[in-house]
């Protein structure tokens, strides 16, 4: 079985890693839209257009299912993708919500994400339907920190404190509502202390067990729309080793 995964950049590699750890034999094609990262500051129409282009690229590679490893794209484009792309499409939001509701003891749940994801209200609506009190916060500097490899240290600590100080003592569970954010999990957990941190990439990989046939050849192709200088560093940081990368060629508008 061949799985297509796309994200606005390298953050979706956390989803790829979670899927590969659980399903060892699947073939995976990954597309990171590094030329247009971040999606979280774009308009709804632009996010949908970018998502359709990425999904179309993966479909042309012959994938059997598509995983939208970007929370912003999941929030704005998932329903459109399901209508227009003739393969099953899965997003990261619903699995993350289910996991948070299961883990939370007092149903006081925080959500952090890009400005677009938080503005969409996608997490908030689903959590409130589950009876949770929701505290949502956009953390726009987290994606650039992750993309630059600044995963810990003084700068990252100060940015984490700046965004999350209002959560301290108010929540018992936090959803990392962006696939870049697990890269900063160490500093986030250190600052928040005794709070359950939900990684949507892990929740998503678990939710796919009814749809994935673990019967491929374990092949992996990594495509990116821009081969940035720190790309190999980030791939090795997330996946644990170097992998060859290819420049994605196709209809990628700006």
UniProtKB/Swiss-Prot annotation:
Classification via PANTHER family: GLUTAMATE RACEMASE
Protein name, as recorded: Glutamate racemase
Disulfide pairings: none
Keyword Transmembrane helix (UniProt): no
Record-linked Pfam families: Asp_Glu_race
BP GO annotations: cell wall organization; peptidoglycan biosynthetic process; regulation of cell shape
Assembly notes: Homodimer.
Signal peptide span: none
Catalytic activity: L-glutamate = D-glutamate
InterPro entries: Asp/Glu/hydantoin_racemase (IPR015942), Asp/Glu_race (IPR001920), Asp/Glu_racemase_AS_1 (IPR018187), Asp/Glu_racemase_AS_2 (IPR033134), Glu_race (IPR004391)
Native organism taxonomy: Bacteria, Pseudomonadati, Aquificota, Aquificia, Aquificales
Pathway where this protein functions: Cell wall biogenesis; peptidoglycan biosynthesis
Function: Provides the (R)-glutamate required for cell wall biosynthesis. Converts L- or D-glutamate to D- or L-glutamate, respectively, but not other amino acids such as alanine, aspartate, and glutamine.
A single MF term (Gene Ontology): glutamate racemase activity
Entry similarity comment: Belongs to the aspartate/glutamate racemases family.
Keywords, in A-Z order: Cell shape, Cell wall biogenesis/degradation, Isomerase, Peptidoglycan synthesis
Temperature-related properties: Thermostable.
Binding site for substrate: 7-8, 39-40, 71-72, 147, 179-180
EC annotation from Swiss-Prot or TrEMBL: 5.1.1.3
Record: active site: 70, 178
Gene3D superfamilies found in the cross-reference section: 3.40.50.1860
């Amino acid at each position: 079985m061949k799985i297509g995964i796309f994200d606005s950049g390298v953050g979706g590699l956390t989803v790829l890693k979670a899927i590969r750890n659980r399903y060892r034999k699947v073939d995976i094609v990954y597309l990171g839209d590094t030329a247009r990262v971040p999606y979280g500051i774009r308009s709804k129409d632009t996010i949908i257009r970018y998502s359709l282009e990425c999904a179309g690229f993966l479909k042309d590679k012959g994938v059997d299912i598509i995983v939208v490893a970007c929370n912003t794209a999941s929030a704005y484009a998932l329903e459109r993708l399901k209508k227009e792309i003739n393969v099953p499409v899965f997003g990261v939001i619903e699995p993350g919500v289910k996991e948070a509701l299961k883990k939370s003891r007092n149903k006081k749940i925080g959500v952090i994400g890009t400005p677009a994801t938080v503005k969409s209200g996608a997490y908030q609506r689903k959590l409130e339907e589950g009876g949770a009190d929701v505290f949502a916060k956009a953390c726009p500097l987290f994606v650039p920190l992750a993309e630059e490899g600044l995963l810990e240290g003084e700068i990252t600590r100060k940015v984490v404190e700046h965004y999350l100080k209002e959560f301290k003592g108010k929540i018992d569970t936090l959803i990392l509502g962006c696939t870049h954010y697990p890269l900063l999990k160490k500093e986030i957990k250190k600052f928040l202390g005794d709070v359950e941190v939900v990684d949507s990439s892990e929740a998503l990989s678990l939710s796919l067990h009814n749809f994935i046939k673990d019967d491929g050849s374990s092949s992996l192709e990594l495509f990116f729309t821009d081969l940035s200088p720190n790309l190999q560093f980030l791939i090795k940081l997330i996946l644990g080793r170097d992998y060859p990368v290819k420049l994605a060629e196709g209809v990628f508008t700006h």
